[in-house]
Amino acid sequence: MPLAKEIPTPYVWSYQPQMGVPAGASQDYSTKINCLSAGPRMAQTVFALRDQRNRVLTAEAHGQTPRPVVNPASWPAAALSHEPPPPTLLTLPRNEPTEHAMTDAGYQIAGGAAPWSGVKTGSFCGRGLQLAEPPTTAIYPSGLFHLGRGQRLVLDHQPARTLLLESAPSVPRYGGIGARQFLKEFTPAVYPQPYSGPPNTFPDYFCFNYDSVSNSVDGYS
């Protein structure tokens, strides 16, 4: 078909999640237009847009995948993107007796009131801690800061009660690639002559059963 020879459709890669490797590429026939219902002017306009799109896709394929072999048989650790695992958020238990004891002992971040004797509870005993004038804040069991003169400042006290754990693998990952790296590097590729080109120019790595070690497709000589 002359129209198909003139304007090739891009090859879209598929992903094999179990092995972490691309499973070949196939033509995206959804990008074809219905040439029977399109007039000559519309067809030429669409062809020009499609040709420009193919140039953009080709440039992306060369830029995003700068490897000698597009789909190698094995992926060394240096070629894999090492993304840290998501952090784990742990909620720490509250120590209510300690908070009550601190409040009863009169802990203040700032204030000017005369030092006063606190209530002795266990090993917590205080006479107040004041830093500045006038009376300003005291820590309450609720975890909020209480301002002097009847005002209250509500702060987000969750960070003080949570623990964020972040970990990273001690050994670099190797083997297959992840889905995010696949989407980033295996952009749609364009084969200029999908129907009229000689067989030896077809990119064999588009085939899902292509073996890059032997440079052959399984089942074909």
From Swiss-Prot:
Pfam families: Adeno_PVIII. Residues 113-150 form a propeptide. GO terms for cellular component: host cell nucleus; viral capsid. Cleaved by the viral protease during virion maturation. May cause the middle segment to be shed from the capsid. Keywords: Capsid protein, Host nucleus, Late protein, Phosphoprotein, Virion. It comes from the Viruses. All late proteins expressed from the major late promoter are produced by alternative splicing and alternative polyadenylation of the same gene giving rise to non-overlapping ORFs. A leader sequence is present in the N-terminus of all these mRNAs and is recognized by the viral shutoff protein to provide expression although conventional translation via ribosome scanning from the cap has been shut off in the host cell. This is Pre-hexon-linking protein VIII. The gene is L4.
